[in-house]
Curated annotation (Swiss-Prot):
Domain I is involved in oligomerization and binding regulators, domain II is flexibile and of varying length in different bacteria, domain III forms the AAA+ region, while domain IV binds dsDNA. SMART domains: AAA, Bac_DnaA_C. GO terms for cellular component: cytoplasm; plasma membrane. It comes from Proteus mirabilis (strain HI4320). GO terms for molecular function: ATP binding; ATP hydrolysis activity; DNA replication origin binding; lipid binding. Belongs to the DnaA family. ATP binds at G174, G176, K177, T178. This is Chromosomal replication initiator protein DnaA.
């Protein structure tokens, strides 16, 4: 049996799995084949458990394909494989980081002179970390829409600077990106009390740089930002058209990466779609791992409501949670805001929380949602997005240029309205409910396999929910 067995498995897995999944879970594995046993080494327990749960059947099937009856046994371990085996079985890297000119500094954090505060008033470490202690992994509600993002953030928290660097999270407003940033920061500081973790909105970075320039303290600014263990920046798209800020962040990024210091960035869009940001920065954003967070599906929305109610020590009936979740779909923030309103009204009036009570408490919000998202609106939005006519969506045409948008519109109608499958079918030229069901399943499958379809779905959800 050749020592290249794992390389053959890798090639097949790369073809079979979505690129994000392969990069996140399979690429970090190291392999050693010895005494008819294939040992797979994972960087941490989290990756090991995930691979064993999600991909062991894929791996075993490939071993049977390649080895026939002489299938090696499979063993999982945490750590690195023996040094003697690394030259032949290490997982190949596909990203090579160009050399950079910035020289990282390992000096202690310095007082930013642009803040004009006496040194004695500042903590020695972690000053102005801005990490919110309330946002942790334990109270982040996981679902299919955010599962990969949470898993990636968890790995980074367990191995900052060594797992995925940078980690780039993108998605619409209110989907949990900021929560994950804080969760990573909290986790790192729990493991290492004096860790130098800084969270900020991108506009704060710009403001700090402007103050540093005004106070002739740009060198202090550089030393401060290049001395952190983890830099967590929210809404990186606000760097757009700020050339000096981009220039400074470019060199800060390079210095941190060379020093194996963790960088996590968030944006409301895919890196290459951020207008007004230099190509060299957008390229670097993709050096590590880029993961999308999508609007939560029904089950996750219900779980979020139940979790929030539990935190407020409120008994929320299941049917009420489903009623709210079916009608408010755009983001987590909207869900939590609606529940806060329901709880406040219940406290003020002393009434029990029922569907009728919720319908009354949220009547303006529910009326707005029903007005905004209709099948007609979905059809018009999808037709405009794909540059076809609404009549094409209703026609019998089956060419891919029409069939795929039609399937997308049907899937969106199921996701964003309360219409039944037969009602959706009727609205699309009198189609059978099984056609609608097939369309929904097809789009769900394609969202897993195709970055373009995933982006189209997310973009249309944002447009229809805004």
């Amino acid at each position: 049996m050749s020592l290249s067995l794992w390389q053959h498995c890798l090639a097949r897995l790369q073809d079979e799995l979505p690129a994000t999944e392969f990069s996140m879970w399979i690429r970090p594995l190291q392999a050693e084949l010895s005494d008819n046993t294939l040992a797979l080494y994972a960087p941490n327990r989290f990756v090991l458990d995930w691979v064993r749960e999600k991909y062991i059947n894929n791996i075993n099937a490939l071993l049977v394909d390649f080895c026939g009856s002489d299938v090696p046994s499979l063993r999982f371990e945490v750590g690195n494989k023996p040094v003697s085996a690394r030259t032949t079985e290490s997982v190949p890297k596909t990203v090579t980081h160009p050399a950079v000119n910035s020289t990282p500094t390992n000096s202690q954090p310095v007082r930013p002179s642009w803040d004009n505060q006496p040194q004695s008033q500042l903590p020695e470490l972690n000053y102005r970390s801005n990490v919110n202690p309330k946002h942790k992994f334990d109270n982040f509600v996981e679902g299919k829409s955010n599962q990969l993002a949470r898993a990636a953030a968890r790995q980074v928290a367990d191995n900052p600077g060594g797992a995925y660097n940078p980690l780039f999270l993108y998605g619409g407003t209110g989907l949990g990106k900021t929560h994950l940033l804080h969760a990573v920061g909290n986790s790192i500081m729990e493991r290492k009390a004096n860790a130098k973790v800084v969270y900020m909105h991108s506009e704060r970075f710009v403001q700090d740089m402007v103050k540093a320039l005004q106070n002739n303290a740009i060198e202090d600014f550089k030393r401060y930002y290049r001395s952190v263990d983890a830099l967590l920046i929210d809404d990186i798209q606000f760097f757009a058209n700020k050339e000096r800020s981009q220039e400074e962040f470019f060199h800060t990024f390079n210095a941190l990466l060379e020093g194996n210091q963790q960088i996590i960035l968030t944006s409301d869009r895919y890196p290459k779609e951020i207008n007004g940001v230099e190509d060299r920065l957008k390229s670097r954003f993709g050096w590590g791992l880029t993961v999308a967070i999508e609007p939560p599906e029904l089950e996750t929305r219900v779980a979020i409501l139940m979790k929030k109610a539990d935190e407020n020590q409120i008994q929320l009936p299941d049917e009420v949670a489903f009623f709210i979740a079916k009608r408010l779909r755009s983001n987590v923030r909207e869900l939590e805001g609606a529940l806060n309103r329901v709880i406040a009204n219940a406290n003020f009036t002393g009434r029990a929380i029922t569907i009728d009570f919720v319908r009354e408490a949220l009547r303006d919000l529910l009326a707005l949602q029903e007005k905004l998202v209709t099948i007609d609106n979905i059809q018009k939005t999808v037709a405009e997005y794909y540059k076809i006519k609404v009549a094409d969506l209703l026609s019998k045409r089956r060419s891919r240029s029409v069939a795929r948008p039609r399937q997308m519109a049907m899937a969106l109608a199921k996701e964003l309205t309360n219409h039944s499958l037969p009602e959706i079918g009727d609205a699309f030229g009198g189609r059978d409910h099984t056609t609608v069901l097939h369309a929904c399943r097809k789009i769900e499958q394609l969202r897993e396999e195709s970055h373009d379809i995933k982006e189209d779905f997310s973009n249309l959800i944002r447009t229809l929910s805004s």
